[in-house]
C-alpha cells in the first residue's frame, strides 16, 4: 500500500485535473519518477518533492507531514 506522501501526490494531482504526464512536465520531473512516487515504489527525494510541491502550489511541509 502506498505511503501518505504517495497518496497526497496522487490526490493533489487529481484535484488539479492533471494526468501523470502533465504533472511531470509541469514539475519538470521524469514521468516514470512521478508514477513510482505515486505508487510508493520509489522513496521521495527532497529535490523532487520540492519541484512537485512548487508545481502544485503547496509547501513541501504540506506534502511530507503526516495527517
Task: Mark where each language-model region is.
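Residue-level detection of the helix-turn-helix DNA-binding "recognition helix"
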Residues: 14, 28, 39-41
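Short alpha-helical DNA-recognition segment
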Residues: 18-36
